[in-house]
């Protein structure tokens, strides 16, 4: 695009110069100088007119250019090369027939130069694009591992070589003809058989008559259809395999490929430098992944080529085709063999087909040209790949050569290593071919000729046989079974693993010849299915057990290690004559038998990280081998499907086994019921008798509760009632027990009523005790003198501390304030306000009980006062019990008792309406007797409940006044008092320890402290402390009298 813009710009610039530079519109010629005149006659030369004022600036002579230029008719227009021969001083040159003014010639010269440069640029750009496209096509052939290696660029069709001409003579004739027809070969491109083109019949006939005479092989179809690509080979692993010499590189060019794009080249199609034998003995290679029509369905496997550069196909030399007898040979690069396809390909081509199979010296990339293959009987003649290298290489050197690295595991290497087994192999191959050839009447003639050639071939030496077999390029049918231990089908794509890997891992594995459909055997007339194989043949084939002869049949009892059967979806599959029914059954059984399921190992998988090195990267798969048999024995999973699998293999019993139990109930529920029955140690008869009589004392509360837990669902109850004794299903112990209970009408309703009767006494007793406790707690709080003394002390202390505030001069406080006394601490950080109040009450109570003021009496008074204060917790014991109760729970218990009475009345009515049996009468009578007594008890409990709740309400109002209505919890007052009593008890213990310490210090002259590590107090301080304590005691006694008087006034 940029080039055309540049060229257009140059044209515009040149035209603008012509038009606008000199402004000589009328004085310039109408037509260009280098173009012929519009009319044949040319006017005579005219001189320059005097009125013409426009002259070129470079011309000094006015008569140099006339007004109308002259165009001579006789001479042709000058070529562009003549413009380059003008001298530099063109202005002084006098040309009699000047056709152009000097300025115009310069400008047109610029245009011509730009055109030439642009054309060169276009050619360079086209060459660059062609080079990039060819490079991309080559990269596509080698880079993509997921596609097949040999794409449509490797689709080559070659005729079979003539079997009459000797190799040397054919080589000489080909050389001479190729030297003389080098130029004609390039021009007559129709002689090369490209995909999708027509064959030049005249040129082909002449060439075939001059080189080969009359060809014994009938011709192919003229309209060739696209062939499938060859199987992908792992050539990237060995880059040296594709290297060739200078002669090969010089003789290489590319042709359009047969794919849809039509861009990739066909590798090395017939150059003059190649020998005629290679031209004749060409190779047809294609891939099974692109097999198109049934008409082209003859599959013959060949050795895989190592590199596209190594394949040296030649232009086909064929005679006039006969479409009526067309057989399209397609050589599949698949490691499988179809003997039927080989037999169908031998129709009317006995001698030629045999020579193509066993004598053709060209294999796509593994063999060399015949002119260099001097020793055809040598085992190395089929494996040498370079004409310059092969005659000098020994077998050891060939195996070590890097250029043969990909071919080191080639399937035919086994024949080179052990050529002595070729006769046995040929015998087996002949027998297999005979079974196929005799099965089709249309191929009888070709089959007989082919078998004769096989007999002649067996008489050769092992080395020559190995050489001829290994060097077969077109129908190397013996190579496929070596590399393919698996069955192949028409629908199967190219195998994922290359033949190299398959051969290296499965040399000892018995091959499986592929099953092919009748439409694959022949495109025109499908042959009938082959007859069953004869037994003596298998006996003879099973005797060959050498490693190299991998075509021989293994023992019939040993199936292949990895059977692989892919039957065709749309076509019937015929059994191969080399496949026994026993092996097929064994392979199918091996496929159907899955590995046993093991116990799961629950772990958290870690994702592999590519940006850091992990320990898992150093693990090798081959470093540890798992003992499959041991792990399957130890950790096999116990699945529930084992019993059904066993029942499928064994005949199903008509009658159920006697151990079939627990068919109605859930297994877990049945097991729980059985455990309860064994723990309770009762029989079914005892339970049924108690239910019929309504005797709750016989069963007890625990058994009745267990029976309620055993209650079945409606579905289970329906199944149990529908069960008959004649049923083949045997009931378990739990199911029998439930069925016996369900035979009693409304059995579980009876159980519920009897459980209520059994629990009634205990429920009533608990409620009575609870209500009595509440009444006693209320009485204790109202009559406790010490609790009132504590409230008085707290009130005086709080008023003293709240002097001058709004909270001062209080007459009462809520009991919740008692819990806040421990939060107010003194200056030392240890003594709290509750400590102070308790010490003052202890001193006052001791003084009141003793009545003496001496030092010894003071200590006794403290002891007496501490005992009185400590007894407060014991005085309010019912308050602690009442604090553990919940008013809502007590109310629910009372309501349940009243509802239970209603349920019993309903059960009695149901029993009386349904049946009149004696058992039901006994149950009703017992229930009625209980109802009379229960109703009286419930009335008493309800009355006691109302009394207790009213007392709780009164005591709350007694302490809190009108604020009792704000209480959300009726029993909260008991909770507060219980918590305060716990704090007072702890403080009394601490004060008792202080008093003991004071008693020990006052008993000695120099009192020893409780802690011996502390320094002893001075004697003067002791006297001061005694005097201060005596004075404080006298003052407190007087203050106690004043406080008592004030409290009496408030009350």
Swiss-Prot record:
Induction: Up-regulated during gall formation induced by root-knot nematodes. GO terms for molecular function: actin binding; actin filament binding. Residues 207-216, 512-522 have a biased composition (Polar residues). The keyword Signal applies. Residues 35-48, 525-536, 1009-1018 have a biased composition (Pro residues). GO terms for biological process: actin cytoskeleton organization; actin nucleation; barbed-end actin filament capping. Residues 49-71, 180-190, 278-301, 401-410, 459-473, 484-498, 1027-1038 have a biased composition (Low complexity). It is a single-pass membrane protein. It is found in: Membrane. Pfam families: FH2 (PF02181). The chain crosses the membrane at residues 108-128. It comes from the Eukaryota. Residues 1-21 form the signal peptide. Residues 588-1010 form the FH2 domain. Might be involved in the organization and polarity of the actin cytoskeleton. Involved in polar pollen cell growth process by maintaining tip-focused cell membrane expansion for the polar extension of pollen tubes. Interacts with FIP2. Belongs to the formin-like family. Class-I subfamily. This is Formin-like protein 1. It comes from Arabidopsis thaliana (Mouse-ear cress).
